[in-house]
Amino acid sequence: MSDFIGVYENAAPTEYCERMIARLEELDTTTSSGCRGEVANGGLGNRKDVSFYFERDDQVLAQETNQILDQALAKYMDEHPALGMSQFYSQVVKVQRTPPKGGFHRWHAEQGSELSSATRCLVWMIYLNDTPEGEGMTEFIEQGTRLQPKQGTIVFFPAAWTHTHRGNPVYTCEKYIATGWYYLA
């Protein structure tokens, strides 16, 4: 039986990943439109990261991201044909840098009762850099699965509670991802 976690290595070109990281760093020094997440203790994890929404801050890279995702999504849909019966779209391209010991380590699902997340059906994520073995893994509690970040790998998984997950900490490097959601139309 499938765990519905689609992992597609080398699906995003190295050059694209490097441009995404460079653009995030550039935006972080030239604009205030980024979102800085900082939460300490209180059971909420230790979140310290910076994110930019490229559909607002860099439409060219956002469009390129969607083209790359379309190719990998076609493979995922071949493996899960029932998904093709739904109409859905992705409009958010969130690019995120997590520093050593930062991140959001609390178990969570991407679909919730709030209007902004209620219609999320599928999560996508692109690892933009490698992390050392055992660092920065994405962990799924129900599936007992841990994914090691590897540059260019695209991951898809359902947004519902069945795929409750967390990002495990990096200790020796920064972790870069692009992420977003497919929404039911």
Describe every region a protein language model picked out.
Residues 1-154, 162-185:
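Fe(II)/2-oxoglutarate oxygenase catalytic core
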